[in-house]
C-alpha cells in the first residue's frame, strides 16, 4: 500500500475544473478536453510507471482491442497517443499472427500507404542513396522534422510523412532525381515490397583512385596519344594552324611537349589535363577526356626540407597573369591595407601561423573591419537578397562557386542581368556609404566541366565586372596560389580562414533573424587528411576538392554554412606575408556536424582554366 497516494494539489485542481465545467452550460466535454483534464502529472522517478504503462498498453491494445481513451490511459500524452493511434488503426487489419501485428506497430514493415513504416531502408527502389532529412543538399526539402514533427524523419530513412499514394519515399542524393519511392517490406505478405526494386545500371561510384597502370601521370603532360576530340565532342584545331599559332605565341609552353597535328596535349602543365584549341571565338579551347591518376598537390606530397619550420622556401612573389587582360592588383595582392601594409596583425592570424609551425560560419566570430578586403557579396537583384560569397582577385575579376550561378535542383540559372556584386562590405544588410562599392556584371563564366549532376566537381565560376573597382582600405584583391605555396601550406592540420555572412547555425527556424549575422563572420579551420575526407561521405570526392573542419574529438568547433558558399578559404604565407585563396566554399552535409567536413574547390587545380578564360575574354 506504500505506493498509493492521495489526490494531491494537481488532482484537486483538475477535479475543481471538472466540477466547474459540469455546472456551466457546457455539460459535455470534447474528448481531447476531457483527456487533458484527466491527464496525470508526470513524476521524475517514473521508471516503474513507464514499465507499468507499457504493460497496460500491451494488455489493452495488443492482446485485446482498445479504444483511443484506453490507449491514452496507458500513454498519458495526447501527442504520443495520436502517433500510436494512427499506427494502431492502420495495423488493426493484421492482428494475427501476433508477430505480424507487432512488426506493423513497431514500423518494421509497411501497411496500406506505409505511414506506419519506421524501418532503416535508406535507398530508393532504383538504388539511389537517400538524402538526409535534415540536409539541404542536393535538394531543398519542403518536408522536414519541423513541418512534420511526428513523422520520425531520422537520418535518411525512407518515410511517408505526406501520405503519398506510392508509399514510403525519400529525397535522393542524385541532383537529377528529387524524390523517389523506396522498396520496403509489406506487413503480412512475405517477400512482397511496396514497389519492386529496379536498380539503375552503372552502380555506385566509390571514392577509389584510378587503377594503377591505367591512368596518366602529371595530368597528361607526357601524353603522346592521338586523341583529337574534346570532352564536348569538338574537333581539335591543328597546333600549326594560324589561329593556334597566334594564340600560342605568348603562352609559356613546355618545349618538351611536342605539339603534333591536332592531338590533345598539355603544354602549359594545366592541372585540368590535356586540351586543345577549337573553332569558334578566338581563343576557344576545350579539355580532352583522358584518365588521369589522382595526384595530390600539397596534402600528401610533403618535403620536410621545404617545411615552414625550415624556412627554405623562396619568399619572392612572381606575378602569373597578363595585366592587360587580368587588370590591376596582382602585384600587390594579399597585402591588406589595414594590416600587412601597416605591419599589423589581426586578432586571430597567430592561430593560423601557429598551426603551420606546430603541425556555411558556425561557431565563428565577428570579423574586424578590413580583415578580408577581398570578400565580395554576390547579390540577387529581384527579390533583393544575399545569394553567395565571392572573392576579388583583381580590379576586374571576381571568383565564386559555380553552384551559386547554376544549380537546377534549386532552380538556379542566373545571368549577368540577375546579379550584382557588393565589395568592401562589413555589415550584412546595411548600405555602407563611402565604403562599399556596387558593381554590375559584364559576363559570367562557369567552368565547362562543372558537374552539378553528381558531386559539384569543378565548382568554380568567374565574374567579369563592367567597370574596374577602385581599391581602398576595405577593397583589395587576394592572391591565387602557385604550386610552391600550395605544397608548403595546404597540409593536414594547417589552418585556413573562411569568411562570410552565412547562417550562424543549421536550423529549420522560420525566424531567419535568429540565425543570420549582422556583420561579416570569420572562422579558422584545420585542413583534413584526404582519406578522412573521403571516408566521411558517400559522395565521390575528386582531386579538385579538399576538405576542412574539426574532428569529432576536437574541443573547438566551426564550419561554413548556408550563405557562405562561393566565399574564400584563405591562408597566410609566413614567407612573404601575403594571403592566398586556396579554396572556394563549395558544399557540406549540414553545418558543423560531428564527423562531417566542409568541402572546398581546389583553386590551384583550376588556375590554368582561370588564366585561359581571362586571357581570352579579358
Swiss-Prot record:
Region (High affinity receptor-binding region which is also known as the TP508 peptide): which ranges? Answer: 548-570
Keywords for this protein: Acute phase, Blood coagulation, Calcium, Cleavage on pair of basic residues, Disulfide bond, Gamma-carboxyglutamic acid, Glycoprotein, Hemostasis, Hydrolase, Kringle, Protease, Repeat, Serine protease, Signal, Zymogen
Q: Where is the Peptidase S1 domain?
A: 361-615
Quote the cellular component terms of the Gene Ontology held in the record.
Answer: collagen-containing extracellular matrix; external side of plasma membrane; extracellular space
Q: Does the keyword Calcium apply?
A: yes
4-carboxyglutamate sites (modified residues): 50-51, 58, 60, 63-64, 69-70, 73, 76
Q: Where is this site: Cleavage?
A: 200-201, 311-312, 360-361
Q: Where is the Gla domain?
A: 44-90
* Propeptide part(s) removed at maturation, as residue ranges: 25-43
- How is the protein altered post-translationally, as described in the entry? The gamma-carboxyglutamyl residues, which bind calcium ions, result from the carboxylation of glutamyl residues by a microsomal enzyme, the vitamin K-dependent carboxylase. The modified residues are necessary for the calcium-dependent interaction with a negatively charged phospholipid surface, which is essential for the conversion of prothrombin to thrombin. In the penultimate step of the coagulation cascade, prothrombin is converted to thrombin by the prothrombinase complex composed of factor Xa (F10), cofactor Va (F5), and phospholipids. This activation requires factor Xa-catalyzed sequential cleavage at 2 sites, Arg-311 and Arg-360, along 2 possible pathways. In the first pathway, the first cleavage occurs at Arg-311, leading to the formation of the inactive intermediate prethrombin-2. This pathway preferentially occurs on platelets and in the absence of cofactor Va.
Tell me which residues are glycosylated.
122, 144, 413, 553
* Coiled-coil residue spans: none
Q: Span of the secretion signal?
A: 1-24
Which cysteine pairs are joined by S-S bonds? Answer: 61-66, 91-104, 109-187, 130-170, 158-182, 215-293, 236-276, 264-288, 333-479, 388-404, 533-547, 561-591
Q: For this protein, what is the EC number? A: 3.4.21.5
The molecular function terms of the Gene Ontology recorded here are: calcium ion binding; endopeptidase activity; heparin binding; lipopolysaccharide binding; peptidase activity; receptor ligand activity; serine-type endopeptidase activity; thrombospondin receptor activity
**Regulation of its function:** Activity is promoted in the presence of negatively charged surfaces, such as polyphosphate and dextran sulfate. Inhibited by SERPINA5.
Is the keyword Calcium in the record?
A: yes
Which catalytic reaction applies to this protein? Selective cleavage of Arg-|-Gly bonds in fibrinogen to form fibrin and release fibrinopeptides A and B
Q: Name one GO biological process term.
A: negative regulation of cytokine production involved in inflammatory response
Family matches, as PROSITE patterns: GLA_1, GLA_2, KRINGLE_1, KRINGLE_2, TRYPSIN_DOM, TRYPSIN_HIS, TRYPSIN_SER
Q: What does this protein do?
A: Thrombin, which cleaves bonds after Arg and Lys, converts fibrinogen to fibrin and activates factors V, VII, VIII, XIII, and, in complex with thrombomodulin, protein C. Functions in blood homeostasis, inflammation and wound healing. Activates coagulation factor XI (F11); activation is promoted by the contact with negatively charged surfaces. Triggers the production of pro-inflammatory cytokines, such as MCP-1/CCL2 and IL8/CXCL8, in endothelial cells.
Q: Note the subunit structure.
A: Heterodimer (named alpha-thrombin) of a light and a heavy chain; disulfide-linked. Forms a heterodimer with SERPINA5. In plasma, interacts (via N-terminus) with alpha-1-microglobulin; this interaction does not prevent the activation of prothrombin to thrombin.
Q: Which family does it belong to?
A: Belongs to the peptidase S1 family.
Other remarks on record?
Answer: Thrombin can itself cleave the N-terminal fragment (fragment 1) of the prothrombin, prior to its activation by factor Xa.
State what protein this is by name.
Prothrombin
| Source organism of this protein record | Mus musculus (Mouse)
Kindly list the organism's lineage: Eukaryota, Metazoa, Chordata, Craniata, Vertebrata
Its encoding gene is what?
Answer: F2
Amino acid at each position: 500500500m506504500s505506493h498509493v497516494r492521495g489526490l494531491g494539489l494537481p488532482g484537486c485542481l483538475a477535479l475543481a475544473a471538472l466540477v466547474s465545467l459540469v455546472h456551466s452550460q457546457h455539460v459535455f466535454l470534447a474528448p481531447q478536453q476531457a483527456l487533458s483534464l484527466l491527464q496525470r502529472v508526470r513524476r521524475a522517478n517514473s521508471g516503474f510507471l513507464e514499465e507499468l504503462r507499457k504493460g497496460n498498453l500491451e494488455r489493452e491494445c495488443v492482446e485485446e482491442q482498445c479504444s483511443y481513451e484506453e490507449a491514452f490511459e496507458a500513454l498519458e500524452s495526447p501527442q504520443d497517443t495520436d502517433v500510436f493511434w494512427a499506427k494502431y488503426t492502420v495495423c488493426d487489419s493484421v492482428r494475427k499472427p501476433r508477430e505480424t501485428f507487432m512488426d506493423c506497430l513497431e514500423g518494421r514493415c509497411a501497411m496500406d500507404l506505409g505511414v506506419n513504416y519506421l524501418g532503416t531502408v535508406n535507398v530508393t527502389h532504383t538504388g539511389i542513396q537517400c538524402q538526409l532529412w535534415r540536409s539541404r543538399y542536393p535538394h531543398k526539402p519542403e518536408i522536414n522534422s519541423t513541418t512534420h514533427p511526428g513523422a520520425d524523419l531520422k537520418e535518411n530513412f525512407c518515410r511517408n510523412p505526406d501520405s503519398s499514394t506510392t508509399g514510403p519515399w525519400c529525397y535522393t542524393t542524385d541532383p537529377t532525381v528529387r524524390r523517389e519511392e523506396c522498396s520496403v517490406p509489406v506487413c503480412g505478405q512475405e517477400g512482397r515490397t511496396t514497389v519492386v526494386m529496379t536498380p539503375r545500371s552503372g552502380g555506385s561510384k566509390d571514392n577509389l583512385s584510378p587503377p594503377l597502370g591505367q591512368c596518366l601521370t602529371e595530368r597528361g603532360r607526357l601524353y603522346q596519344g592521338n586523341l583529337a576530340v574534346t570532352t564536348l565532342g569538338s574537333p581539335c584545331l591543328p597546333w600549326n594552324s594560324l589561329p593556334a599559332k597566334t594564340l600560342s605565341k605568348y603562352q609559356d609552353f613546355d618545349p618538351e611537349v611536342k605539339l603534333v597535328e591536332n592531338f590533345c596535349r598539355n603544354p602549359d602543365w594545366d592541372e585540368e589535363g590535356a586540351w586543345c584549341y577549337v573553332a569558334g571565338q578566338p581563343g576557344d579551347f576545350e579539355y580532352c577526356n583522358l584518365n588521369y591518376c589522382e595526384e595530390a598537390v600539397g596534402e600528401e606530397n610533403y618535403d620536410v626540407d621545404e617545411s615552414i619550420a625550415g624556412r627554405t622556401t623562396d619568399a619572392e612573389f612572381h606575378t602569373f597573369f597578363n595585366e592587360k587582360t587580368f587588370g590591376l592588383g596582382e602585384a600587390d595582392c594579399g597585402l591588406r591595407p589595414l594590416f600587412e601594409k601597416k605591419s599589423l596583425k589581426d586578432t586571430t592570424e597567430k592561430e593560423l601561423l601557429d598551426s603551420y609551425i606546430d603541425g556555411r560560419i558556425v561557431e565563428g566570430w565577428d570579423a574586424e573591419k578590413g580583415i578580408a578586403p577581398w570578400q565580395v557579396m554576390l547579390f540577387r537583384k529581384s527579390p533583393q537578397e544575399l545569394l553567395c560569397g565571392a572573392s576579388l582577385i583583381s580590379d576586374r575579376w571576381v571568383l565564386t562557386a559555380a553552384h551559386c550561378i547554376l544549380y537546377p535542383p534549386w532552380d538556379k540559372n542566373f545571368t549577368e542581368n540577375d546579379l550584382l556584386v557588393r565589395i568592401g562590405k562589413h555589415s550584412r544588410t546595411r548600405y555602407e556609404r563611402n565604403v562599399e562599392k556596387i558593381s554590375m556584371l559584364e559576363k559570367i563564366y562557369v567552368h565547362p566541366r562543372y558537374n552539378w549532376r553528381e558531386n559539384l566537381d569543378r565548382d568554380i565560376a568567374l565574374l567579369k565586372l563592367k567597370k574596374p573597382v577602385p581599391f581602398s582600405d576595405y577593397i583589395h584583391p587576394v592572391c591565387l596560389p602557385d604550386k610552391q605555396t600550395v605544397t608548403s601550406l595546404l597540409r593536414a592540420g594547417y589552418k585556413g580562414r573562411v569568411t562570410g555572412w552565412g547562417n550562424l547555425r543549421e536550423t529549420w527556424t522560420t525566424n531567419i533573424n535568429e540565425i543570420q549575422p549582422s556583420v561579416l563572420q570569420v572562422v579558422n579551420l584545420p585542413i583534413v587528411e584526404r582519406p578522412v575526407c573521403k571516408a566521411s561521405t558517400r559522395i565521390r570526392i575528386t582531386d579538385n576538392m579538399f576538405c576542412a573542419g574539426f574532428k569529432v574529438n576536437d574541443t573547438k568547433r566551426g564550419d561554413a554554412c548556408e550563405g557562405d558558399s562561393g566565399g574564400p578559404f584563405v591562408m597566410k604565407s609566413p614567407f612573404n606575408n601575403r594571403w592566398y585563396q586556396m579554396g572556394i566554399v563549395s558544399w557540406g552535409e549540414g553545418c558543423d556536424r560531428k564527423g562531417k567536413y566542409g568541402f572546398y574547390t581546389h583553386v590551384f587545380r583550376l588556375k590554368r582554366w582561370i588564366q585561359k578564360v581571362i586571357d581570352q575574354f579579358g
